[in-house]
């Protein structure tokens, strides 16, 4: 949410954008939940039950401008990677493994959601958001790739190396 606001914040009054609500809720959630780990625990159920993937697929059905279509195509591939590692983690049926990769999974979901919001805004107001959409999608794609590779290559047997 903070990354999304940084991009939108430069264009003026942020109450006009969907990410304003996400930013506001993220700040409140931090106060009430206490720690990022508790937020991870709360969010991971929606990652593993397919809610975030379904939301991302719904966002894909929202038309975007011709200029934003190449970004949308890249974003669809990012969602494919998110779904692939989410499904692989669920299929492993290892709670410790899920706990270990949970934050990476929800970070993948988060950057995909924020990318969709930017593409939607860039479609409506390209003069304000087109460049930001390109910049943020480059960042988000790198983050998804990083987490995708880590989760895909990680073996449950390696968990021992991460314990105290």
Regions found by a protein language model. Give the residues of each.
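Flavin-dependent oxidoreductase catalytic core characteristic
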Residues: 1-164
């Amino acid at each position: 949410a903070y990354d999304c606001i940084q991009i939108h914040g430069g264009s003026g009054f942020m109450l006009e954008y969907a990410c304003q609500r996400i930013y506001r809720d993220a700040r409140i959630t931090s106060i009430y939940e206490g720690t990022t780990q508790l937020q991870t625990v709360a969010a991971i159920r929606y990652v593993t039950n397919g809610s975030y993937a379904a939301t991302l697929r719904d966002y894909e059905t929202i038309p975007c401008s011709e200029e934003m279509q190449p970004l949308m195509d890249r974003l669809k591939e990012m969602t494919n990677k998110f779904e692939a590692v989410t499904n692989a983690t669920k299929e492993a049926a290892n709670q410790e493994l899920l706990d270990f990769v949970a934050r990476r999974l929800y970070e993948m979901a988060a950057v995909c959601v924020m990318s969709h919001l930017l593409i939607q805004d860039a479609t409506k107001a390209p003069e304000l958001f087109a460049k930001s959409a390109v910049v943020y999608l480059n960042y988000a794609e790198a983050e998804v790739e990083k987490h995708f590779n880590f989760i895909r290559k990680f073996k449950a047997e390696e968990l021992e190396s991460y314990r105290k």
